Amino acid sequence: MPTPLHDAHPIVAAVRQFVDKEVVLAASSFEHADTYPHDLVARMRELGLFGSLVPAEYGGLGLDVATYARVIEEICRGFMSLAGVINSHTMAALIVLQNGTDEQKRRLLPRFASGAARGGLCLTEPHAGSDVQAIRTVAKRQGDGYLISGSKMFVTNGREGNTFALLALTDASAKPRYRGMSCFIVEKGHAGLQVVKSIAKLGYKGVDTAELLFDSFPCPADNLVGGVEGRGFKHVMSGLEAGRINIAARAVGVAQAALEEAARGAHGVAEPPAALASIAIRVDGARLLTYWAAGMKDRGERCDLEAGMAKLHASESAQEAAADAIRMLGGPGQATSGIVERLYRDTPLMMIGEGTNEIQRTIIAKNLLQRHGERLGALTSLEAEPEERRQMALAVRQLVEREIAPAAVEDDRAGRFPSVSLDKLKALGLFGAVIPQDMGGLNLDGPAYALIAEEIGRGSASVAAVLKDHVDAADLILRLGSAEQRQRLLPALASGKLRGGTLRRLREPARREINALSHADGFILTGDGLIAGPGRHADVFVLLAPVDERLIAFLLEVGQPGFVLAEPFETAGRRGADLWHTQLRGCVLPSSQTLGGEVAPTSAAIAGAQASARVREAAAAVGLAQAAFEAALRYSQQRSAFGVPICQHQAIQLKLADMATAIAVARLLTQRAAAEDGAGDAAPAHAAMAHLHAAETAYMVTLESMRIHGGYGYSAEFPVERYYRDASALLAGEAGDEALRRSIARHAAAGATLDGGPA
């Protein structure tokens, strides 16, 4: 995601100012007239954007990919077409930078950086789109050069540009075919190149997109990229990796614009529509995934899988955001006097460009299978984590695979409380996960616990839920309790001598709401709309209840007069978690049994604790989704249909790609919220986003895993039916509560900056 480091580069502020003061005002006139924005392009040249990724030694800005993506996002927030001029040019420059000879770099890169060379890509042909290997354009050697013949389609900058990276066949007999492909830098100014026509389009107007015809066009051998034939396909693919990140950044910018327009439409409305929350979650998820891939690219890591996921998710999110904005705005949303209808027309391009999303899904699935076998290693990699955090997570992962996951099968069948697994976690010190070390705890930060909670959730949703209840109670006492309460309770909770739990209200009309009234020197509580987790196995519970329009945190102990565990709460999923319906029958509590005692906690402190609890639930949901995905990945390789493993069937590949991408987004949303640890104005909204998306992802992935397994997925002999049942607990909780969506919608409608995006 964008970090202060990315925004700190002066070019980001300069581009934002350029967009706000010049681009936004002029975009509609250029777009409706479909005229090339010469003045805006000239300004981008003045800003140095044509040399964005060209190193300073060649006259460029030398930006990293993440900062460049930030620049592209800003431009697309104002006018997506304008970014096309830069992106196509930059891809051509990157091909030379990454693959050219030293002489080619010295000769061409300064011209690309200055904008004297206006670049583009000549890849697509009338009969070869996403399948680049199907090209027919040929380059025949003649003397000291080549003669190029063929037709290229959808060339951005085709009319206004002058220097193109072109892929052609130099050996049509090569097997496999890509080994006969070479990449050339072709420059206008010679006979044999004709701009056949500019292509009329649904959107992406104002920038020229042309068909070019090459008829024995001469190209000097010095312009063969790298100086060696047969390497062109690799050269082009290396450029497309960055190109997909750029497409993702463009999509994020357009989605951000749609969010802002939808938020403006909801401004002043007493209760913003919940649909605004969906847009905000999509925008944030797309942004996080895009900058995750960009960061990997900058670190020199292989990121073709991650770049493809970013392109897929961001482009789909932009399309959905634009459509939702039109739904929200109604008639004004489709008016040509506004910009939402332009966004609606622009977004399909990003689902098609740099490889259609359907082809992208098949590539993602094949990549997952080839690179990671039966484990989604790249998406659970801990290499970038601090050593101590990594070692703890690895220890938990080993315990999960060796003991917790196998035990979960029998515990679920018997409906048995997972005491043995919990004792194993207690031995690792995880009962004191968030408790300070001087009180016997581990003092794990938010991201560390999220990693661990995901691993536990991957092994057993019930174990993850019970541990979460305990940690939630400890965290509330830590954040809200008095010094005496912390000293008395936290060491015992850390060691496991006391087990904590929470009381949460049910969304159940037949149950009475909790009523807490001031009474003498304390409070009296009545009501029966509560679930206690983990029921009979907890010693102390924490309840948040409203008193005089503010929340108070109450401590209730098992055996407290008026506090009754009424009956077991049997559920489809998370069997054995020992949930109980409870009743408060005039339960009288002195002030000493409120967290903080006489000093009531602030609303911000309570909101922070609630946010962190939602993050812990999100992390466990990601783990559940991960388990279901791994099961599907294994089964798809083991099961055959029509003579081949079902993972080779496109329908299965599309599902695997969507499942993996959704999990990656859920994990990134969760880790972002975990890093905030409930602190900051945006933390509650970010935690809610993570919670909602992770819960929906767990449901989607468990269901899709069942589809892939077929009848076996419905059978109790396979774990998938348990995963699907466990997902129901997530939907029945806060994730199904519209109040949580409305809180996100209010955050978006208020114009809060979402992860670096413009307000």
Give each language-model segment a name.
Residues 2-6, 10-11, 77, 183, ...:
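Glycine-rich beta->alpha junctions and the first turn(s) of the following alpha-helix
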Residues 24-32, 263-273, 280-315, 326-334, ...:
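C-terminal helix-coil-helix/basic helical segment that borders enzyme active sites and/or dimer interfaces
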Residues 46-115, 156-163, 297, 345-346, ...:
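Internal helix-loop-helix
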Residues 70, 91, 329-385, 452, ...:
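Glycine-rich phosphate/cofactor-binding loops in nucleotide/flavin-utilizing enzymes
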Residues 77, 153-158, 204, 348-354, ...:
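Glycine-rich phosphate/pyrophosphate-binding beta-alpha loops
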Residues 115-123, 167, 495-507:
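A short, Trp-centered hydrophobic/proline-enriched beta-strand micro-motif
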Residues 137-140, 516-517:
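A structural signal for short hydrophobic beta-strand segments in well-ordered beta-sheet cores
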Residues 145, 149-195, 522, 526-566:
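A short core secondary-structure module
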